[in-house]
Amino acid sequence: MNESFDKDFSNHTPMMQQYLKLKAQHPEILLFYRMGDFYELFYDDAKRASQLLDISLTKRGASAGEPIPMAGIPHHAVENYLAKLVNQGESVAICEQIGDPATSKGPVERKVVRIVTPGTISDEALLQERQDNLLAAIWQDGKGYGYATLDISSGRFRLSEPADRETMAAELQRTNPAELLYAEDFAEMALIEGRRGLRRRPLWEFEIDTARQQLNLQFGTRDLVGFGVENASRGLCAAGCLLQYVKDTQRTSLPHIRSITMERQQDSIIMDAATRRNLEITQNLAGGVENTLAAVLDCTVTPMGSRMLKRWLHMPVRNTNILRERQQTIGALQDTVSELQPVLRQVGDLERILARLALRTARPRDLARMRHAFQQLPELHAQLETVDSAPVQALRKKMGDFAELRDLLERAIIDAPPVLVRDGGVIAPGYHEELDEWRALADGATDYLDRLEIRERERTGLDTLKVGYNAVHGYYIQISRGQSHLAPINYVRRQTLKNAERYIIPELKEYEDKVLTSKGKALALEKQLYDELFDLLLPHLADLQQSANALAELDVLVNLAERAWTLNYTCPTFTDKPGIRITEGRHPVVEQVLNEPFIANPLNLSPQRRMLIITGPNMGGKSTYMRQTALIALLAYIGSYVPAQNVEIGPIDRIFTRVGAADDLASGRSTFMVEMTETANILHNATENSLVLMDEIGRGTSTYDGLSLAWACAENLANKIKALTLFATHYFELTQLPEKMEGVANVHLDALEHGDTIAFMHSVQDGAASKSYGLAVAALAGVPKEVIKRARQKLRELESISPNAAATQVDGTQMSLLAAPEETSPAVEALENLDPDSLTPRQALEWIYRLKSLV
């Protein structure tokens, strides 16, 4: 059956009518329909779930004359199945029984109590603990884009207004949302197609007036001026849709979402999608996390610290006051790393626990972990009290103390609580007198049954008599079959077994009712007390969130202090003068994976030396040298120490990389097209304060075309844009650029060749390389010897041609490839319009004289 929810359900059974009405409210997502100890799925949902979860597809009777496809999962294992579905981009509506089966006439009342989507999950079983899980919304109008992100597991709410497609693509790549909401008339589908968790939303959800109203209601404000977003209309359209979606799916208040922040381009160093990919900040080129900058730098001891560090890496700040404060804190903490990290490790993921507290989905073990985090605060305060640093003391103040809340949780929650409050045994003995009384009554059953058994044996003289309990029949007195005929007259038969009879007596029945009542009342009271704990904790939510943020930042800074000490990093100096000066710089990732010592190299970029033409052999280290420069700059601008002996760095507004490329087959773009698209982005957007890495521009086309393009790009970057540029090339003709342009210098990475072997020195030297060593590298790669021999012969032939001919052509006539088309001469235009077959001999002679006059 294809589900169609606009028709009459009357020919279905009452239970299926209830299901179909609920399903009609959530037609596009899976519905988990609670039936006893299982969540059931029916019809198309069952078919989809059986494929996605690899569970059995069965049939359940018939409704409306048709068998019903059905699949089910045990309720106690639901989180595991939800995790699988969420990881595949699916959303699920959870439908629970809310009525009492004992009093219900017809199907038990049910309703959808929550909707689980990839971008709105907060349960720790469904989340990657060291990675942000973002819900995002995108909006577009004629002036640009609006973009909003929310991490519901922390309450972090951000918006931005990317001006163009490239900036928007970079934001999507940086934030990598788990779920992306877009308007039904969104024009740039090519920008988002293929992304996970795409959700098409109606236009009215993006209306600006509705958005302002929603946000003011959420924050309890009259306007949004205090958040600095009042005039960000495109961003607010996206934020309004996002907030509406969260309210629709969570179906509860969201007290932990207390503010919204505008992210402005001018506040951070801008990196486009290609740059983030090429620098392998948190993901390597193969899509993994090994051998990335984060893999080397992230030794944080809390999940929330790890997530904050990754946010810093993807959004380096330009405010040098913030950066110097971080540097000072790192320096001040270096002597206390070994004492602080073990204590911080015990804090855990307080940030996400607080989000679950706000959503009222926190479990008993969440509260136990919160208590454990509070118990670490006195030790952290004591250790930080002696650190002579204003930023450290500011962090210490934000951490707070929460002694009263710690005392509350120590009194209220047992040391090792069960997973769920419905299991009972969560509230500690002594916390509530009435609960202790009900528990004592329930727990005293064993003593009573022992006494009853002894008394009845003595009274009846039956030595096989014993008292017991099972979940189906309750309490009973059991007598063997051989003695059952001696049972007293007041014994009422309850159950017959193969070798025994079971009885009940009024006294035991009365006690059974009392015990079962006490257990039920104890569980109900325990649930009530647990809910009251939320009411006692939530008024402190704002201070608790501030504390969690301070603890995460402390973890990041202590981690950076440890990394600086362990990896021999130095504190960079910021200057207002443009340029980058590095002494003995190292690649932070490559030096960790090498078995031999890394060869450190210097770098000097300044207004007088703003472009380096880098030549040298393949595998000589050109790309490593370029990337290490960008990574050192990136680390400096998150406030970290850097892998070098000394670094002085001026203002940087953007980092661009045009390093390596691959075919973009999905978009129908060749390697060369990808390369040129990235190059065009750099030439349009780079400024004199940008750091630009250009590697092997011009590959993938003919030699002269490639050389001409490389020459023109270098010329544009050096003379017009004046960006700080590292330009690696195998076109040796480009080494003549320093003679023709100011601010350009040659450097090279050397190698030693001996016979058929080659040794790479990996050391950067001034001047151009003497040769490429391409044949030696080919031999090293295992190219057959006869091919290498023939290549040497051909090389000698080509080298017999004047080596400067190509450069002369590129500098002169060949550059016309990139110049504007020349105007067509009048003589040529006249000839193009001439029809020679229609001319008489006299007219032909006249045309000769006319053309002569036009030349």
Swiss-Prot record:
Gene3D superfamilies: 1.10.1420.10, 6.10.140.430, DNA repair protein MutS, domain I, MutS, connector domain, P-loop containing nucleotide triphosphate hydrolases. InterPro entries: DNA_mismatch_repair_MutS (IPR005748), DNA_mismatch_repair_MutS-lik_N (IPR007695), DNA_mismatch_repair_MutS/MSH (IPR017261), DNA_mismatch_repair_MutS_C (IPR000432), DNA_mismatch_repair_MutS_clamp (IPR007861), DNA_mismatch_repair_MutS_core (IPR007696), DNA_mismatch_repair_MutS_N (IPR016151), DNA_mismatch_repair_MutS_sf (IPR036187). Keywords: ATP-binding, DNA damage, DNA repair, DNA-binding, Nucleotide-binding. GO terms for molecular function: ATP binding; ATP-dependent DNA damage sensor activity; damaged DNA binding; mismatched DNA binding. One of its GO terms (biological process) is mismatch repair. One of its GO terms (cellular component) is cytosol. Pfam families: MutS_I, MutS_II, MutS_III, MutS_IV, MutS_V. This protein is involved in the repair of mismatches in DNA. It is possible that it carries out the mismatch recognition step. This protein has a weak ATPase activity. NCBIfam families: mutS1 (TIGR01070), PRK05399.1 (NF003810). Belongs to the DNA mismatch repair MutS family. This is DNA mismatch repair protein MutS. It comes from Salmonella newport (strain SL254). The gene is mutS.
